[in-house]
Every structure is written in C-alpha cells, then in structure tokens.
C-alpha cells in the first residue's frame, strides 16, 4: 500500500510524498503525468498483470504509446531493445502471455515497466510468485538493469535472504508502521527493534553448528487488527520488552546511529 501510494496508484489521506523537491500528492492530471513516466511498477503476479488478449509487442509498446510519440520503426526498435535487455528475443513479439512460463511472463512485465526509461521503480514482491529456481535469475537481472539504467528500486519482499542480497537500505514495517530503517549490512549485523530481531532470528541457517548458536525469538501475544490498533506502540501486544509507556504513546523514529533509525523506547 505504501509503495503504491508513492507512485500515486493510491491517493494518500495525509502527509506529503516528494519526488525530488515536488510534492506529488498535490498534483493531478497533466501536472502529474510527467512524474508517472518517471515512476513505474513491476507487479507481483505475472499471470494476472498481463492482458491475455495482447501480444508481447502490444504489451511492451502500450506504455510507449501513452507516454511518447514514436514512429513505427523507432517504436519497434525500442521494444526489441528492451526485450533483449530482459533476456528474450524478437521471436516473442507476436506471442501471447499464455505461451510463456511464469519467469518469462515476469521478464515481459519488467520490460513493460522499464521501456519508458523510468527513474524510480516499485518492485512489488516481483519474485514471490516464481519458482525458486528462477528467482535468483530474475533478481540478478534486476540488479544488472539497475546498474545499466541508473534505476532506484523500492523492493517490497518478505524473503529476508533475498532482501539482504538486493538491498542497500532497508525499512522494516509492522502493521503499516515503519519500525526501523538502516543500511542493509548494519541491520543484519546489529538490529535494534525487537520485531526486527525476531524476524532475523527466523532466517534458516543451513549450517547446523551455526544454527545451534542462534537463539530463536518466538513472539507471543495476539496480532491486532490493522483497523483496530491498540494505543501506543503498534508492536506492544507482542513485544517481550513492553513497558507501561509503550501502551501510552507510540515511539517515533529516532537516530540510534548514523543512518540507522528505530522507533523504540529501549
């Protein structure tokens, strides 16, 4: 939800969203259009995000038709070049989504998002619907494209090992609240929020000797309904270190170390 609000697929009910120095929450219509081209999304499900009645050329070309006025030849060249960047060739152009595997469909979805040369890309769990054997290939491709095209990613994921691999900076959310923000290496080395510590302790470790040295943090308590949150800290019902003041007021993000923020009273 936060990511989709950031690219204005959802309207926000409060606060500001700044792209560079412009608050895009105040923009509509033609004023917002240039920013929409600079922000794109790679959807989670490659099976439902592609129109089954459009072939690959139409799917990748549609964003170009909406955002740029290109001649037929230049349009075709842009589509072919983008298709090659995601590891597919021109033989796919006349085919339809049902003729491809899940990994190939996601590559088409990535090409569709990047063909207009955006600057900011929301990757909404782009590998969670893919076979495990393909996930690493897609992530490595996304990293290569990031370097080649100068992209900024907001990568939404629940796979903590994959998050560690692809991220430079991580924000941890609990029930819609950001509880910790940190450079990736520092977060995995020294997590500060109790929820982050519990998450990282749950990562499977293939080495049995090392696994025995890790203390798993099992959370108790009930997960509150997002529509009926408790007073104070959103994590208070499950936190093993909860104090009376945690129920009275929610802690705000504070800087615990350079670039490392945490919303906790501890």
Task: Show the residue positions of the predicted features.
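P-loop NTP-binding/switch modules centered on Walker-like glycine-rich loops
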Residues: 126, 130, 134-212
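Helix-to-loop junction immediately C-terminal to a conserved catalytic motif
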Residues: 7
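Conserved ABC transporter NBD signature motif
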Residues: 15-23
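Charged, flexible cofactor/metal-binding loops and thiol motifs
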Residues: 90, 183-265
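Conserved ABC ATPase "signature" region
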Residues: 22-23, 73-91, 200-201
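A short, proline-enriched helix->beta-strand linker immediately N-terminal to the Walker B motif
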Residues: 115-119
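ABC ATPase NBD coupling module
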Residues: 24-40, 66, 186-191, 224-230
């Amino acid at each position: 939800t936060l990511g989709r609000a950031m690219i204005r697929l959802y309207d926000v009910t409060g606060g500001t969203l700044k792209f560079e120095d412009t608050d895009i929450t105040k923009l509509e219509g033609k004023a917002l259009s240039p920013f929409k081209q600079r922000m794109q999304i790679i959807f989670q499900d490659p099976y439902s995000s592609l129109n089954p009645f459009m072939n690959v050329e139409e799917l990748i070309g549609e964003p170009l038709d909406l955002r740029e006025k290109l001649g037929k030849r230049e349009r075709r060249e842009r589509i072919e070049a983008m298709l090659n960047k995601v590891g597919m060739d021109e033989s796919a152009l006349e085919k339809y989504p049902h003729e491809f595997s899940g990994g190939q469909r996601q590559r088409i979805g990535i090409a569709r998002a990047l063909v207009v040369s955006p600057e900011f890309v929301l990757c909404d769990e782009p590998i969670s619907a893919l076979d495990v054997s393909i996930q690493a290939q897609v992530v490595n491709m996304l990293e290569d494209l990031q370097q080649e095209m100068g992209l900024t990613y907001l990568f939404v994921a629940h796979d903590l090992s994959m998050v560690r691999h692809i991220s430079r900076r991580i924000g941890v959310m609990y029930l819609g609240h950001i509880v910790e923000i940190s450079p990736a290496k520092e977060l995995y080395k020294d997590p500060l929020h109790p929820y982050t510590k519990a998450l990282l302790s749950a990562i499977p470790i293939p080495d049995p000797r090392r696994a025995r040295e890790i203390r798993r943090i099992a959370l108790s308590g009930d997960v509150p309904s997002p529509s009926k949150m408790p007073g104070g800290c959103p994590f208070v019902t499950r936190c093993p270190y909860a104090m009376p003041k945690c129920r009275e007021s929610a802690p705000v993000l504070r800087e615990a170390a350079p670039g490392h923020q945490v919303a906790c009273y501890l």
